[in-house]
Curated annotation (Swiss-Prot):
Motif (DEVH box): 185-188
Domain spans labelled Helicase C-terminal: 276-430
GO biological process: interstrand cross-link repair; nucleotide-excision repair
Keyword Nucleotide-binding: yes
Similarity annotation: Belongs to the helicase family.
Domain of life, source organism: Bacteria
Enzyme class: hydrolase
Source species of the chain: Bacillus subtilis (strain 168)
Domain called Helicase ATP-binding: residue spans: 63-243
Residues that, per the record, bind ATP: 76-83
Protein name per Swiss-Prot or TrEMBL: Uncharacterized ATP-dependent helicase YprA
Record EC number: 3.6.4.-
Gene that encodes the chain: yprA
Annotated keywords: ATP-binding, Helicase, Hydrolase, Nucleotide-binding
């Protein structure tokens, strides 16, 4: 049978009735500038061997700004040569003066390893003795000593910087005395709690640099987000120059939204996205068109992989289709990456591990199983197809979830608007106090010293009263025997964490993670299904007193969702927007939450297939919230009906908030109350699910009119009769729920 070309397959797809939007991105010519004359001849020769004799405009701009001592954030698409934006000035600096040093921060170990091998290839071709080392948990003690003394370029991650480098800075004197550049790659991944912690780690890093007499320039790179310059400045505390004049070429891209057919009309349930992805990928692979499939979890990766291998084993054999996810050994991952670059591997099914800048060469087709959760992630994944020249195809196959349905019905949101803003709150008191402890352990604090832009004398006095610090004249010294960084996780806002223990293999019981207490109530109760790096675990026992959750690997087709009985108390109102019938506020609240029952929800249809009780004590959370009060409701709506309508609105808002604010669905909780304690009015609260808040609720307050408009659009365009899991929740009998909810949302806008 004659193989079809990609062009023919694209033409066939145009006739598919499930294609709901077809967006074409025109090809773009390269925009280049000559190689700057100041660049060392050995670097020019090494780049020339790799076919690089000119620079793209963004690489040229980045080099010029950094040479002037400006800190920069470079924002260009995947595979546009961002790495040269930092490698070039760093290598130039060390070629000019071999005492100069650079620190590279990557969010994952895999990415650090990948960048190290690319960097070492250039260094080898330069013929200069520049030593670059990765420094992570796998680095052997013998190598560690070498890195500290002789590493020109130290490649690590924020967790190692926080717990292994900064507390032992006296062993790293040659790095800190001569540190010229700090590179932060994949800046957009530093958001929420993690980003708020990392901003404080950077404050500690800058403090130690000042102590050793260095003032490094920051070179950041980011995927496309709405606020890269602002995020870079918040994270580093330095003014940033934005470099976004992308000069890299790209071929024609077809970006297709595909909505599976409805199989249950009353409930508006569609055929599973996984089944559609299998069929679509099969067509490309059997015609030998190199394809990448993205799935949200490891379990889904393995399911799709086995299905596709089965579907195409006669045509191309199973060896040329591989899975790729965290948990694979580095050797195996390198082999898959090489196979993709060289064309021996035709298809790969991956979690978002391949979203970040690992070099896998040029693929022709990218298929996404569902919306990846943010516009930035979707564009990162799309960038994996047609990385250099030639035509490419991206297909996003929608799930039945409200957020997926909103995206495929509103392509203009996806293609025309700026993507989401990444939010951090380095001043979160719990996070800030933790890092002040670490900073005081590293170097004594002067009484008048600032940390970031904050005066911290009150906090230092408090820590002295708690006997954590000891004051001697004008300085505060660390007074405790303990080592603070080892007890502080960068992934959690509160350090009173529940440790998650995997006992799937009794001979190899291991800790796989931790979670703050407040989240653990709803995500780690007995019988909960917990997802860790895409693997499903069931909680066999939550030992609340000793803060341990014992889990075992399972493979099930449902997830669990806990009901919380929530009492909210408003502590302080900071901002208000008044409308004739509603008021929108932002401020501080306490949340008293008691988990009551959990439900088992089927992944494909969102049906409730079982439930059980949760026996845990009440917990209190101090956080920030945005809340909307309805001052006057229509008189013909009874209290019971209004309560149901508020629940419906809450369901929609819970799904829509992550479309506008870069966060996961569980980061902002939505709770409705028919009579709020402080006013007696019907109220919907949207609160940060982290102690102290991390800036998400404030962003909800700022962007509420956009969020409200999106909620109305979602309900209006949902084809169900009067409510379904894809919009306001299951049907509310006999009250014209959709119509009335739209009226209420109109009053709020």
């Amino acid at each position: 049978m004659k193989k079809k070309s990609l062009t023919e397959l694209i033409s066939d797809l145009k006739g598919n009735e499930n294609v709901v939007n077809w967006h074409e991105i025109e090809p773009r010519e390269a925009k280049t500038r000559p190689m700057p004359e100041s660049i060392d001849e050995r670097i020019k020769a090494a780049l020339s061997k790799r076919g690089i004799d000119e620079l793209y405009t963004h690489q040229y701009s980045a080099f010029q700004y950094v040479q002037k001592g400006e800190s920069i954030v470079t924002v260009t698409p995947t595979a546009s040569g961002k790495t040269l934006c930092y490698n070039l000035p760093v290598l130039q600096s060390i070629a000019q003066d071999e005492t100069n040093r650079a620190l590279y921060l990557f969010p994952t170990k895999a990415l650090a390893q990948d960048q190290k091998s690319e960097l070492n290839e250039i260094i080898d071709e330069m013929g200069i003795d520049i030593k670059s080392f990765t420094y992570d948990g796998d680095t052997s003690p013998a190598i560690r000593q070498k890195v500290r003394k002789a590493g020109h370029i130290v490649i690590t991650n924020p967790d190692m910087l926080h717990s292994a480098i900064l507390p032992h800075h006296t062993k790293w004197v040659s790095l800190f005395e001569n540190l010229k550049y700090i590179v932060i790659d994949e800046l957009h991944t530093y958001r929420g709690v993690f980003g708020s912690h990392v901003a404080n780690v950077i404050r500690r890093l800058k403090r130690i640099c000042r102590f050793y007499g260095s003032d490094p320039v920051f070179i950041c790179t980011s995927a496309t987000i709405a606020n890269p310059k602002e995020l870079g400045e918040q994270l580093t505390g330095k003014p940033m120059r934005l470099v976004d004049d992308n000069g890299a070429p790209s071929g024609r891209k077809h970006f297709v939204f595909y909505n599976p057919p409805i199989v249950n009309k009353p409930l508006n349930i569609r055929r599973s996205a996984t089944a559609e992805v299998n069929e679509l990928a099969k067509e490309f692979l059997k015609n030998k068109v190199q394809t990448i499939v993205f799935a949200r979890s490891r379990v889904r990766v393995e399911i799709i992989l086995s299905h596709i291998q089965e579907l195409v084993k006669k045509e191309i054999g199973t060896k040329s289709i591989r899975g790729y996810r965290g948990g694979y050994l580095p050797k195996e991952r390198r082999e898959i990456e090489r196979g993709l670059r060289e064309g021996d591997i035709l298809g790969v099914v991956s979690t978002n591990a391949l979203e970040l800048g690992v070099d896998i060469g040029q693929l022709q087709v990218c298929v996404m199983t569902g919306y990846p959760g943010s516009v930035a992630s979707a564009w990162q994944q799309a960038g994996r197809a047609g990385r250099r020249h030639g035509e490419s195809l991206i297909i996003m196959v929608a799930n039945s979830t409200p957020i997926d349905q909103y995206i495929v019905r509103h392509p203009e949101y996806f293609f025309n608007r700026s993507p989401e803003s990444a939010r951090i709150n380095p001043e979160n008191l719990i996070i800030l106090v933790d890092h002040l402890k670490c900073a005081a352990y590293e170097l004594p604090f002067r009484a008048d010293e600032e940390f970031g832009a904050m005066e911290v004398s009150d906090i230092l006095e408090y820590l002295q009263e708690e006997a954590v610090l000891h004051r001697n004249g004008e300085r505060y010294h660390w007074a405790s025997e303990s080592f603070p960084a080892s007890n502080i996780s960068l992934r959690s806002a509160s350090q009173e964490n529940v440790v998650i223990v995997d006992q799937s293999d009794i001979a190899n019981v291991r800790i796989i993670g931790e979670m703050d207490r407040f989240s653990a109530m709803t995500l780690l109760h007995d019988e909960a299904i917990y997802l860790h790096e895409g693997v499903q675990y069931q909680v066999e026992k939550l030992d609340w007193d000793h803060k341990k959750a014992y889990v075992r690997k399972v493979d099930v087709e449902y997830y669990t969702d806990a009901n919380l009985a929530v009492q909210l108390k408003v502590l302080e109102i900071d901002k208000t927007k008044e409308k004739s019938r509603t008021s929108l506020h932002y401020g501080d609240v306490t949340v008293n939450a008691l988990p009551t029952i959990f439900k088992k929800i089927k992944m494909t249809t969102f049906e409730n297939i079982g439930s059980g009780p949760i026996h845990l004590p009440e917990e209190e959370l101090h956080t920030s919230a945005a809340w909307l009060e309805i001052k006057t409701a229509d008189e013909d709506i009874g209290e019971k009906t209004l309560e149901q309508l508020l629940l419906g609105i809450s369901n929609v808002l819970q799904h829509i908030v992550p479309v506008y604010i870069m966060c996961d669905r569980n980061d902002v909780h939505v709770v409705s109350q028919i009579k709020a304690a402080h006013t007696g009015l019907p109220t919907i609260f949207l609160y940060d699910h982290y102690p102290g808040g991390i800036g998400l609720a404030e962003e909800v307050f700022k962007r509420f009119s956009d969020i409200n408009e999106a909620a109305k659009q979602l309900i209006t365009h949902c084809p169900c009769h009067d409510g379904c899991p894809s919009c306001i929740g299951t049907e509310i009998e006999g009250i014209k729920a959709k119509e009335r909810i739209l009226q209420l949302l109109d009053q709020m806008s």
